[in-house]
From Swiss-Prot:
Subunit structure: Monomer.
Key words of the record: Aminoacyl-tRNA synthetase, ATP-binding, Cytoplasm, Ligase, Nucleotide-binding, Protein biosynthesis
Full protein name: Arginine--tRNA ligase
Catalytic activities: tRNA(Arg) + L-arginine + ATP = L-arginyl-tRNA(Arg) + AMP + diphosphate
Subcellular location: Cytoplasm
Lineage: Bacteria, Pseudomonadati, Chlamydiota, Chlamydiia, Chlamydiales
Entry EC number(s): 6.1.1.19
Enzyme class: ligase
MF GO annotations: arginine-tRNA ligase activity; ATP binding
Domain of life according to the entry: Bacteria
Span of the annotated motif 'HIGH' region: 123-133
GO cellular component: cytoplasm
């Protein structure tokens, strides 16, 4: 659907070109108004054009307004030095809601659907997923849901760490201790720690481990059998967590790209991009002080080689139009070097196809990196289990009479919702403080606030004996609270555009929180049952219900019909 912002931008662009045909193409500065008494949107371009046109901003604003059709607006005002404030008419907002209602059911389809690959979560085999994987998994899943909703073909890739020296250590340790079967990741993690200690202390063990890496790469039957067993145990454990988080992923580990590594290095060499540095093969770039090493001095490959091969495969074989990799911001330099190398090699046709979606750290309430008291990473499964228990405690405190059945059903939904929302509502680039106490609050910018507004609408339906709310209804907007709610609802598609453009889910969480506040004000100020506007107000309730439900689904949150 054409958003209010794009509609207004089109009107202002045409008006500026009619008023000042000598101007070249402009990037307009039109934003939602910062305060309600300024109207719905404001155009700030008159100030920018003052120097170019050598006229006062106010005179420029007057010329622009003179070329804008008045029909969609109840007022167009010039304020201050030359800000143009627009207020849409209530009739126009009502008509736009009808279109919004139809398109909400089908998703706001992108004009040019693309093949989008999102690489996220990506834990390492033989290690527990920890709190660092939480951010990648939640952010990646949200972006995948949003891209899918607007019609893109999304491939969700789990680029698990399933190759390398660690497997040589594990295979050697398993061979020497005659362990035939491993059934749980906890056993595997304990073995990994023991194998790592031996590798650091015992030079002979280290040599045998390195030999097993070579054996694995060469397809040795015993080494491959143990490797497959290790991967199977780990992936089963990962899938348990993905089920709890309601996240879908297609696993394609580092090992998948092994057949292409030598060929990629040879191709880079044929393009004169490779320089020998202390025996290692590196790709240098003028813009960076360090190179991307693609082959070690001993002839071995590393994760950079795999990443280059993966990028090439995703473009050439998967036919990706866009590639997103969701990892912590600490890997930013690596991905800048990766992009530069793939551009130079022609694997990436142009800039803008690849994006590193970086994110900050999770901190404890003291502002330190979130770890156990002993300094180890907090296991993700334990964190999720704790969230569910904390949510149950919160429910009991609010509803002492809650049944065990309700507690068992609602606790996991509230706990997982709270964790996801707390993460997504923080700007992904920033570090954020993890606090169960804050994330489980029933007020403020939390998952509980969204859910409470949704449950309130379900309560309206129950009280009035309605199975569903009207999806089509002639609408007339009268009250300020109705107008504010209508305007906020209509901003949903432009917020979705912004979320996907910036790859930042917090724009969506901020919007949904604002929507709950507008709905709560509407519920307070506008009587529904038995009023002259009952059907129209039920229609607004229905649109709010559907928008909240859709928005929460895009965040990966679940709804409840009552609390």
């Amino acid at each position: 659907m054409t958003t209010l912002l794009s509609f207004l931008t089109s009107l202002c662009s045409a008006a500026i070109h009619q008023a000042f045909p000598e101007l070249e193409e402009l990037t307009l500065d039109i934003t939602p108004s910062t305060k309600e008494h300024f109207g719905h949107y404001q155009c700030n371009d008159a100030m920018k054009l003052a120097r170019v046109l050598r006229k006062s901003p106010r005179a420029i604003a007057e010329s622009i307004v003179a070329h804008i059709p008045p029909a969609p607006f109840s007022s167009i005002e010039i304020a201050g030095a030359g800000f143009i404030n627009f207020t849409f008419s209530k009739e126009f907002l009502a008509s736009q809601l009808q279109t919004f209602s139809k398109e909400l059911a089908n998703g706001f389809r992108a004009a040019s659907p693309q093949k989008v690959i999102i690489d996220f979560s990506s834990p390492n085999i033989a290690k527990d997923m920890h709190v660092g994987h939480l951010r990648s998994t939640i952010i990646g899943d949200c972006l995948a849901r949003c891209f899918s909703f607007v019609g893109h073909d999304v491939l969700r890739l789990n680029h698990i760490g399933d190759w390398g020296t660690a497997f040589g250590m594990l295979i050697t340790y398993l061979q020497e201790t005659s362990q035939e079967a491993i059934h749980q990741l906890e056993d595997l993690t304990a073995l990994y720690k023991k194998a790592h200690a031996r590798f650091a202390e015992d030079s002979e063990f280290k040599k045998r481990s390195q030999h097993n890496v070579v054996a694995l790469q060469s397809g040795d039957a015993q080494a491959l059998a143990l490797w497959k067993q290790i991967c199977s145990v780990s992936e089963k454990s990962f899938q348990t967590i993905y089920s709890i988080l309601d996240v879908e992923l297609h696993t394609r580990g580092e090992s998948f790209y092994n057949p292409f590594l030598a060929e990629v290095v040879a191709d880079l060499e044929s393009k004169n991009l490779v320089t020998l540095s202390d025996g290692a093969k590196c790709v240098f770039h003028e813009a960076f002080s360090i190179p991307l090493m693609i082959q070690k001095s001993d002839g071995g490959y590393n994760y950079a080689t795999t990443d280059v091969a993966a990028m090439r495969y995703r473009i050439q074989q998967d036919q990706a139009d866009r590639i997103l990799i969701v990892t912590d911001s600490g890997q930013s330099l690596h991905f800048q070097l990766l992009e530069a190398t793939c551009l130079a090699a022609g694997y990436l046709p142009s800039k803008g196809i690849f994006s590193h979606v970086g994110f900050g750290l999770v901190l404890d309430t003291q502002g330190r990196k979130f770890k156990t008291r002993s300094g180890e990473n907090i296991k993700l499964r334990e964190l999720l289990d704790t969230a569910v228990e904390k949510a149950k405690e919160s429910l009991k405190a609010h509803r002492p009479d809650i049944s065990e059945e309700e507690l068992a059903y609602q606790g996991p939904i509230l706990g997982i919702n709270a964790i996801k929302y707390a993460d997504l509502s923080s700007h992904r680039i920033n570090d954020y403080v993890f606090s169960f106490e804050k994330m489980l609050r029933f007020e403020g910018n939390t998952a509980m606030s969204l859910l409470y507004a949704y449950v309130r609408i379900q309560g309206i339906k129950r009280r009035m004996g309605l199975e569903s709310l009207p999806q089509e209804e002639p609408l007339a907007i009268h009250e300020p609270a109705e107008e504010a709610l209508a305007l906020t609802l209509l901003r949903f598609p432009e917020i979705l555009d912004l979320t996907l453009r910036e790859l930042c889910p917090h724009f969506l969480t901020d919007y949904l929180y604002a929507l709950t506040n507008k709905f709560n004000a509407f519920f307070r100020d506008c009587h529904i049952e038995g009023s002259d506007s009952q059907q129209e107000r039920l229609y607004l309730c229905g649109l709010t219900e559907r928008t909240l439900s859709t928005g929460m689904h895009l965040l990966g949150l679940k709804t409840l019909n009552h609390l």
